[in-house]
Structures are given as structure tokens and as C-alpha cells.
Amino acid sequence: MSSGAKEGGGGSPAYHLPHPHPHPPQHAQYVGPYRLEKTLGKGQTGLVKLGVHCITGQKVAIKIVNREKLSESVLMKVEREIAILKLIEHPHVLKLHDVYENKKYLYLVLEHVSGGELFDYLVKKGRLTPKEARKFFRQIVSALDFCHSYSICHRDLKPENLLLDEKNNIRIADFGMASLQVGDSLLETSCGSPHYACPEVIKGEKYDGRRADMWSCGVILFALLVGALPFDDDNLRQLLEKVKRGVFHMPHFIPPDCQSLLRGMIEVEPEKRLSLEQIQKHPWYLGGKHEPDPCLEPAPGRRVAMRSLPSNGELDPDVLESMASLGCFRDRERLHRELRSEEENQEKMIYYLLLDRKERYPSCEDQDLPPRNDVDPPRKRVDSPMLSRHGKRRPERKSMEVLSITDAGGGGSPVPTRRALEMAQHSQRSRSVSGASTGLSSSPLSSPRSPVFSFSPEPGAGDEARGGGSPTSKTQTLPSRGPRGGGAGEQPPPPSARSTPLPGPPGSPRSSGGTPLHSPLHTPRASPTGTPGTTPPPSPGGGVGGAAWRSRLNSIRNSFLGSPRFHRRKMQVPTAEEMSSLTPESSPELAKRSWFGNFISLDKEEQIFLVLKDKPLSSIKADIVHAFLSIPSLSHSVLSQTSFRAEYKASGGPSVFQKPVRFQVDISSSEGPEPSPRRDGSGGGGIYSVTFTLISGPSRRFKRVVETIQAQLLSTHDQPSVQALADEKNGAQTRPAGAPPRSLQPPPGRPDPELSSSPRRGPPKDKKLLATNGTPLP
């Protein structure tokens, strides 16, 4: 069970327990009453740290989201995840307690479970017995049944998103890809991980999110029983083709009745695929009913009375904000009309569920907080004056912190009047359903980057519209986020009354950034400030020359889709030095894999630039794809018309010790949206910048891979002056004419025969995949 206490409590308990640590650290950081301690992991949207309540000692997991480094669309996904977690209360779903925020960060206070990921459990233990696998499977199905009953589809089920508590019970986490599927509508966005995604999602067709979750459950059950995945390949294109065909090897040691269940769940035709109801009636699923386990009992459903709202009745603004963040209730007029109708409908069910949650777990200002000297301390999202079910406004709760503030300012002198005014203004602007949406889509706090995700409501569904067209058959992949740019149906959400910047001082101090060491065509990005830690950060909206380049080059780096095979991967455990980190800026880049998806470094980028002149965009793209295909063990996918994602896995040696290199390639015009025509009149030429951004993996190997690609790009177009321009841009010395690129000169003792400018003939030798019992799988 969770170590968390009652959810969303509106203040400290009436009793006081002795402090769990008699001598707390002098410079401890706090989020409300929670003291930040070791780093639990690092996710694609931020860090996850352990929080300990300063009075009760309650442990929580605090997900820290840096709003300044993420685009508006990513922040919208975080807000949607918050709203969805408010709808779900189930013993096998990770709970959300509260939400805190300041000018720079968003803090999600989540239930803390100590067992880690099911992924790591499989790495450590290997394939499970049918009895243990059935226990996990039934808990997953129970939680999914509850989610689907409220039209919530997870869409990213995999062992990395399944957590274990201290009693080895399942908690489903990471609802960042989840969506509401209203009525009989279908979803469109291709998302998830290729190993666990169903064929219709891979093909880019409209799909039923509930059926897609069933396919993922079947793949997970297969992994629990076999210790390997039913569909696996080093090449992403080959992997997707295997998933489309749906043909896999069924090991003989799987019980016969379980084999029939697996075949029914891993079924290519969605109409023939087993539903949740059919799974729960299957003989193998029912075979464990006699096994005593109180955690397998079905959770009681939340029943709320759905009454008709009077035409002149007032609707709860917090609930409406949460519904807007779900993505499928953005038409306010239609939403109000459905809420006031006499018939029961989806809108009324969601409205009253959120209102019921707000009434049972009111979010009020914290009391008895520890002394804080922060310039901009995190503040709790609190409720606006609540409405009764008959539309009458209730008196607002106020805490002593708002009425009499005695916090010290940045210089250490108390300024109670000023701080009280700031807190009162903030509490008026940041009210929500105990952590529901605050309309961050139009906040100037968000990054000025061009959005990477597409958010456009489907007709009657809470799913993002798919933009940029379907990927080609050669490079088809499943973007876990929408492609850059978007379809014609995209539109930003309506502006929110709470989308103004949070009041407060200019910002918090940041860690210092060191001066990067320049190497040819390689520029690691320094910290956002580049100044000592006592200097306040610049204004998010401020900029100097080259702001367009910075916003372009600092675009969000989505994690490469797919999961490392747990039967080949060694469990990663952070060191004691990594776990002692307290601040988000100083947290380790190699911390343990987080609970919240695939990981990237948000604090530091490694980028390589290449400038090409007088070449059309189509020719540059063709040359890049040709370079990708000429390097063995390199797979790639198309994110948009000007963006690629690639992964290189070096062959030779045990793969468990080899970390793949994942990077993104972006093409941007240096002359604006309309490049000048070519001299020969063919048009389409201009100056283009090709940016290679490292996502994960060894930096040295990343440089060699990119320089190999660079050598092929430059060999197709003789432009020494442009090469010199690229070297000058990256602060490197110009390479003498005729000198070979560094990619063709591997370092001593570390030969890399696969990185050569000429493609190797013939495919690489296939490797036999070994199951955990040591038998080769065909």
C-alpha cells in the first residue's frame, strides 16, 4: 500500500508528532510541508524527488516540472494528466495528492511506492511463474476496467509504467498519454511504444483506445510469462512490420489455457480481440480466484448523483477548468448546454465526479509550514469558493498564511505586508480542483519554442489530432508526442482567466554554468544563465540577438520510442552521490530510470551544427536519409518534414553493456521561410542549418556517428566555404583541405568498424535472442 496519508488534505493534522529527523539539514528545500530529499529518477518532463512531511514523516514522490524549459503543448499534457488523475481513485493506480507551483516550477505531489518498476523487477528476476504473473495481470486488468468505465484510455501501458509497492502490488503510473474516449468516437493519435502498440496504431488508422490497451496488456502478460517480448527487432522498421503481421512464437512452457488468452489479446483484428469483459471471464484469469489476495478485490465504483443544473445556476469554475484541460470539452457553449440538460450524459458524469472529488478532498492553504527563506517558494493550488450541487456559493477557506505572512524576503528582512499581498494575489489566480488545470497554454512562463505537439480535439473525443500526415512505410514510427507543426485542425485552447504569470520576485537563483570546451562542430549548451548562482535569471520573454536561433535549437527532445529489452538490459541503480542531490539543476544525468517514461536530459544539450548552401530542402532530406541507411545498426524515424529521430546500436560485445546513441536531426532555413531561388532557376536553394541534438547515449560515439553522416552530406556537395562556416559557427578551427573527417579516424583502442563513409554490403548477422531460461528463441 501507499505510504501516503489521506489525499489532498486541507491542512496539518490537529496533533503534532516529533520531527522524524531531530537535526534537519540547514539548507533543506521544501515544497509546502514536504522536505525534498534524494532523487528517485529523471523523466522527460522533469525530476522525481522523494518528499518527507516535516511533521508526520509521510513520504511522497514529487515530480518537478520546469515550465521554462518545456513548450506550451507539453505543459498542456501535464495539466491533462493532472485532471485525469483526479478522476481515478483505484488501489492499483498511482494517486495524486496535491499540486504546488511557483514562477519557474510545477510540483506534482504523488503517492510514493518503494518497489520500483515492474521493468526492473523482470530484469532482476527473469520470467515469472504463472501464479505470480496472474496476480500482476489481474491487478492491471482491474485498474484498466475502472479507467475504461470512465472513458479513460491509458495508451502507453508497458512494464516501465507499472510500479510496485512494498507488498509487490501494481500501481499504474504515467497517464501523460491517456485520453478520454467519449461515446463511440475513435482516437487518431499514434502514440505509445512500438513493442507494446497495436497494429492499427502503427498503421496510423483511427482506433478504439480500449482495444489498444488490451493489446498492450497481452504483450505485458507475454513478457511476464516468457521474460522476452513477442515482437522484437534491432531495426525499428522490421519491428513495426512484425507487429503489423502479429505473428509471434508461443513457448511450450506457457499453460494451454493461457496460450488461448494470449492469442485472443494479441489479435491483429481489433473486432476479434478480446474485450475486458471477455478477459475477466476467461478460465485462466478465473483460475486464481481461490488464491487469497485482498488486493485483487474489485474497487468500489464512485457513484455520484447527476442532477440537472438550473439554467441560471452557477457552474464551478475549477471543475470547468479541469474539464477544459481534458481536451474534449473545449466548446464551452455545448458543455454548458449538456450540463443543464435533463438527460444523463458524459459531460455531467465527468462534472459531478470532479465536483465530488473537490468536496471530499478540499485543497486549502497549508498551515504550520516550516520557516522559508526562498525568494519564490512553491505555493499550493487551492480551491476557489466551492459551489454546492444547487449552484450556491459556499464561504471561502483562508489560512493564516494568507492573513498574516511573516516569511522573510530575499534579503532576509521580514516584509509581511508585501508578501501578504503577493500571496493573496497568487491564491486568487491559482485556484483549481486540488491541482486541476490552470490554463497554462497562454502563459508567458512557458518556453517560446515552436510547439512540438499537436493538440486538436477530435469530434467528440479527447485525443490530439494527428498532424504532418502519416509516416512513410520505410520510416514509420510511433511518435510519443505529435509531430512538429500540425494539421489544419489545430487550434489553441481558449484563453484562461488564470493564465497570467504568477506574481513574485524575478526568479530563483540558478546554478552556475561552466564554459564549454569547443571541439570541431560540437557545442555543449551551458546553463540557462551562464552566471554565478546568486544572479537572478533573465526574464523568460527577454532576449538578445540570436533569440530565434536559441528557441529553434532548444526545441524539446522527445525520448526515442521503444523500450530496451528487459531480458537484455541490466538494472540501473543510482550511486550514493547521485541520490544525495537536492536541487533540480544539480541532479544526476544518469539517475535511475524514472517512473514517468523514457528519459532525456533537460539540463544540458550536446549539439552539432552543419550549414549547407545552395541545396534544395528535398535534396538535403534525401542525403540525410541515404546517410542513415548506409550506416549499419542505425535506425531512424520521421518526426516531421524537417525532423528525424535516429538510434545507433554498436554491434559486438554483450549488448547489455552497450548503451545506444539516440539523437534528433532538425533542418532549419537560415534565410527565413522563403529561401532565395537557385541560380539555375530551379528554385528551392538557400542556406540551411542541420542540427544534430544528442538525446541519450555516449557523447563520443555520438560525435563519430554525426561526423560520418556529415562526411556523406558534404561529399555529395563540394562546398569548402560552407564547411568553414560551420566550423566557425561552432567555435572550432577550420579543417585543412583534403583532411579526412574525424569519423574516419577512430580513437586508439576503440575501433568502430561500422562507422564508415561507405555502406557495408549485406545485412548484419542476426543475433539469437535468449530467453531467461537460456533457450534460443527463433
Swiss-Prot record:
Q: Name one GO biological process term.
A: regulation of synaptic vesicle priming
In its record, the post-translational modification comment is: Phosphorylated at Thr-189 by STK11/LKB1 in complex with STE20-related adapter-alpha (STRADA) pseudo kinase and CAB39. Not phosphorylated at Thr-189 by CaMKK2. In contrast, it is phosphorylated and activated by CaMKK1. May be inactivated via dephosphorylation of Thr-189 by PP2C.
Residues covered by the Protein kinase domain: 34-285
Q: How is its activity regulated?
A: Activated by phosphorylation on Thr-189 by STK11/LKB1.
Q: Changing G327A: what effect?
A: Abolishes activation of kinase activity
Spell out the Pro residues composition-biased ranges: 491-508
What is the tissue localization of expression for this protein? Widely expressed, with highest levels in brain and testis. Protein levels remain constant throughout the cell cycle.
Q: What class of enzyme is it?
A: transferase
Report the GO molecular function annotations. ATP binding; gamma-tubulin binding; magnesium ion binding; protein kinase binding; protein serine kinase activity; protein serine/threonine kinase activity; tau protein binding; tau-protein kinase activity
Q: What is the name of the protein in this document?
A: Serine/threonine-protein kinase BRSK1
Ranges of Gly residues compositional bias? 1-12
Q: Where is the active site?
A: D156
> Mind telling me which InterPro entries this protein's record contains?
BRSK1_2-like_UBA, Kinase-like_dom_sf, Prot_kinase_dom, Protein_kinase_ATP_BS, Ser/Thr_kinase_AS, UBA
Region annotation Disordered: residue ranges?
A: 1-29, 362-548, 719-778
Membership in a protein family: Belongs to the protein kinase superfamily. CAMK Ser/Thr protein kinase family. SNF1 subfamily.
Task: State the compartments where it is located.
Answer: Cytoplasm; Nucleus; Cytoplasm, Cytoskeleton, Microtubule organizing center, Centrosome; Synapse
Q: Which reaction does it catalyse?
A: L-seryl-[protein] + ATP = O-phospho-L-seryl-[protein] + ADP + H(+); L-threonyl-[protein] + ATP = O-phospho-L-threonyl-[protein] + ADP + H(+); L-seryl-[tau protein] + ATP = O-phospho-L-seryl-[tau protein] + ADP + H(+); L-threonyl-[tau protein] + ATP = O-phospho-L-threonyl-[tau protein] + ADP + H(+)
Compositionally biased residues, Basic and acidic residues: 362-383
Q: Which cofactors go with this protein?
A: Mg(2+)
Q: What does changing G391E do? A: In a metastatic melanoma sample; somatic mutation
Provide the function of this protein: Serine/threonine-protein kinase that plays a key role in polarization of neurons and centrosome duplication. Phosphorylates CDC25B, CDC25C, MAPT/TAU, RIMS1, TUBG1, TUBG2 and WEE1. Following phosphorylation and activation by STK11/LKB1, acts as a key regulator of polarization of cortical neurons, probably by mediating phosphorylation of microtubule-associated proteins such as MAPT/TAU at 'Thr-529' and 'Ser-579'. Also regulates neuron polarization by mediating phosphorylation of WEE1 at 'Ser-642' in postmitotic neurons, leading to down-regulate WEE1 activity in polarized neurons.
Gene Ontology CC annotation, any one: synaptic vesicle
From what organism does this protein derive? Homo sapiens (Human)
| Record's compositionally biased regions (Low complexity) | 430-457, 509-533
Positions where Phosphothreonine occurs in the chain: T189, T529, T535, T583
